[in-house]
Amino acid sequence: MTGMEPIAHIHTDLPQKFGIPRNSFLAPHLQGRIVFEPEFASNAAVEGLDSFSHLWLMWRFENGTPGGTAKDIAADAKSRDRSGTNAKWSKTVRPPRLGGAERVGVFATRSPFRPNPIGLTCVKLDHVELTDDGPIIHVLGADLRDGTPIYDIKPYIPFADCHPDATGGWIEDAPWQELDVEFPQALQDMVPPAKISGLVEVLRQDPRRAGSKHEPNRVYHLAYAGLDISFTVDETQLTVVAVNDAQD
């Protein structure tokens, strides 16, 4: 963005586009750490921030991915299929919530393929860690890829930002179908306990591309927290079948 530079980058457990929630708070236990660039790494700059419960993050899309480049966009962690990527904006888009079939205007969506690649996310503030190298802001519920550049941070102010009479447009007529997740205990034991809740929430949202074919025998791979999570999907049932260390 012309005349602007990142003040920080967020570090999350999702290194690829595949698996990133389509909106914040769909996976409310997803952990994120915002680490400032040296020029902005001042403990004084975040004084008073910990009195707020939620924050707004302004960030940048890169080639349609929160913090990624075209080579990072993958259908799953194994294939690195980059089909469907596009560095240009589109006047109309196919929202996943509509099954990837119907088109609506880009400005009536939060599609990444916009004239200006700006993203806006609301997150829950977990805590602010003050270090000798500057503050680290720990947040929950971010829908951002690991390494996404952050351009600004603002407090969420309830009386100004919360509108009880707000309506959701076409989204209200397109409820999202969550998946039932079967995660054998033996495989759960291979995931750090603090990462389990966020992982299950990501899987429940169905990481697959909208309109994916019914392929109950296909094994998908999700890169998460340094792990390769293998799973299958049959109708509305997602089953985790393996957990391994992620391959570089």
Task: Please annotate each region the language model reported.
Residues 1-122, 126-248:
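Glycine-rich, low-complexity intrinsically disordered segments
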